Curated annotation (Swiss-Prot):
Positions with biased composition (Basic residues): 128-148
Pfam families in the record: DUF4666
Source species taxonomy: Eukaryota, Viridiplantae, Streptophyta, Embryophyta, Tracheophyta
Protein name: Uncharacterized protein At1g15400
Keyword Phosphoprotein (UniProt): yes
Regions crossing the membrane: none
GO (cellular component) term, any one: nucleus
Feature: compositional bias, Polar residues: 1-17
UniProt keyword Ligase, yes or no: no
InterPro entries (UniProt xref): DUF4666 (IPR031421)
Residues annotated with Phosphoserine modification: S100, S107
């Protein structure tokens, strides 16, 4: 508990996960944990009645109580994997890595009433300069050739 930061405002300790621990609560939990350990040690010390067989019971070591966690992926009854979470057929090609998520496309411009379009902002791509005059239109002359 020494590793937790102590608040200057209240007499509580706060861990990195944001959970607030009260010192009284921690003291009660420690007491109840000590009581349970004492009960277990008393149970271990009590002599056990002999069973009908004449075999003596070996004391259980702590090493025998602990069992390793099985992490084998191919064991039956384990976690089944699909292609999306790393399982499936073996791939014999070179992978390029993960693909970055797609960027959301911009929302479409929907025209509404005239007031909204009159007072709305212009799209950022089109800048209108009121001082600039439109270019002059040139008429096309048609060259007419006489047919013979």
């Amino acid at each position: 508990m020494e590793g937790l930061q102590r608040s200057t405002i209240s007499f509580r300790r706060q861990g990195s996960s944001g959970i607030v621990f009260d010192d009284r609560l921690i003291a009660e939990l420690n007491k109840s944990g000590n009581n349970e350990q004492k009960d277990e040690s008393q149970r271990d010390e009590q002599p056990k009645p002999m069973s009908e067989s004449s075999e003596q019971v070996k004391p259980i070591d702590e090493k025998d109580k602990l069992r390793p966690i099985k992490t084998g992926g191919g064991a039956p009854g384990g976690i089944e994997r699909s292609r999306s979470n790393g399982g499936g057929a073996q791939r014999h090609h070179r992978t390029t890595g993960r693909v970055s998520p797609a960027v959301d496309p911009p929302s479409p411009r929907i025209s509404s009433c005239g007031c909204c379009s009159a007072f709305g902002k212009n799209p950022p791509g089109k800048k209108v300069n009121p001082r600039k005059r439109p270019p002059k239109r040139r008429s096309r002359r048609r060259i007419v050739t006489k047919k013979r």
